[in-house]
A protein has these predicted regions:
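C-terminal cap/substrate-recognition subdomain and adjoining C-terminal extension
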Residues: 2-16, 20-26, 30, 45, ...
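Charged, low-complexity surface segments at secondary-structure and domain boundaries
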Residues: 7-14, 55, 95-98, 109-115, ...
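Active-site phosphate-binding and catalytic loops of NTP-dependent enzymes
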Residues: 35
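Short loop/turn motifs at secondary-structure junctions and domain boundaries
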Residues: 38-42
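Asp-based phosphoryl-transfer active-site loop
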Residues: 43-61, 252
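A metal-dependent, Asp-based hydrolase signature
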Residues: 61-147, 151
Length: 326
């Protein structure tokens, strides 16, 4: 145990086992941040984009925002007959995920997500999410969701930040949902979140100005929408992108193909059903990984095997080890 502590003081990525994946990260960062290197990239251009669900924290047994939506529906349906009559709400409460996830942009899921916040001000929605996060726990690990993050990816975020990178979340999840907690959980400020967005409207009330959320969708930040969102909301092409599914395929392509700067792509492959979950081509819910995995060797993308490359997956694993060592 003492060796692990000593290593963590000198190794910027101690949760990563030595090997090809870790070496590829260290090598890329060194070459783009070392002054005088032919591959040096100025700090303003060091943009890194990260998917969230399945890349920075688990998307199983259901994505975290979906768990929030289900809990909100269960809370409201008994007193809101109109909401209870919606077929998509009924599908959600019956556990019919296939119906909700049908279509390229998960129209059913987007619809019920909108139902949980339509008519709320942005401040009210933020308070609702905060209250839920304060009591909700991951059903398998029994920990608050903010503690069930991937320790190796958290180390990577901090390593990149220390080397002048600006990290962005680029996720199919709701931007307003993620902005509530990303700074506390990942150290990423809310203005560096690109996600699916709905229409809001301005109102001047007696208490002051507010923004009110509506049922209308503006932008779905998934699949081919991710490069579009990057251009619209970031305005710079990333030099590094990190994902875990075919939903991140276009973002990886946009980052690494014909980029005038050196670039890096990484795919987190879920291969550990003991410590987390194992899935790729035939996931139960989301996270299908076929095309991006097939293209990775051609593009030089790093494929992270969670089982082989990560000696720790979650921060609380280290707490358990410390207790065993005492």
């Amino acid at each position: 145990m003492g060796n692990q502590v000593d290593q963590s003081r000198t190794d910027p990525l101690p949760a990563w086992n030595d090997g090809r994946s870790k070496d590829s990260i260290l090598s890329f960062v060194a070459k783009v941040t070392t002054p005088g290197s032919p591959d040096f990239v100025p700090i303003p251009e060091r943009i890194a984009t990260f998917d969230n669900d399945g890349t920075l924290w688990p998307e199983y047994p259901v994505p975290v925002q979906f768990a929030f939506v289900i809990d909100e529906l269960n809370r409201r349906v008994p007193t809101e007959p109109k909401l209870a009559a919606d077929p998509m709400v009924q599908a959600a409460l019956a556990g019919d995920l296939a119906k909700l996830l049908a279509g390229q942009h998960f129209e059913g899921l987007m619809r019920i997500a909108a139902h949980t916040h339509a008519g709320m001000t942005t401040d009210e929605f933020c308070a609702t999410v905060e209250a839920w996060l304060a009591m909700a726990k991951h059903p398998r690990f029994g920990r608050p969701y903010g503690e069930v993050i991937y320790q190796p990816m958290d180390e990577l975020l901090r390593y990149l930040s220390a080397h002048g990178f600006k990290n962005f979340i680029v996720s199919g999840g709701g931007a307003d949902f993620m902005r509530v907690w990303v700074e506390r959980v990942y150290g990423i400020p809310p203005e560096q979140v690109v996600g699916s967005t709905g229409r809001t409207k301005f109102e001047l009330r007696e208490t002051g100005p507010v923004l009110v959320k509506t049922l209308d969708h503006l932008f779905v930040d998934d699949n081919e929408g991710k490069p579009v969102g990057i251009q619209q909301f970031i305005g710079r092409r990333p030099i590094a992108s990190f994902g875990n599914s075919d939903g991140d395929h276009a973002m990886l392509q946009y980052t690494t193909i014909n980029n005038p700067r050196p670039s890096f792509g990484l795919i987190v492959h879920h291969s550990d059903d003991q410590r987390e979950y194992a899935y790729d081509a035939k996931p139960k819910i989301t996270g299908k990984l076929i095309e991006a995995l097939k293209e990775a060797p051609q593009r030089g993308w790093t494929i992270v095997d969670m089982k082989q490359d990560w000696n720790v997956i979650f921060p609380f694993e280290r707490e358990i080890l410390r207790h065993l060592d005492t």
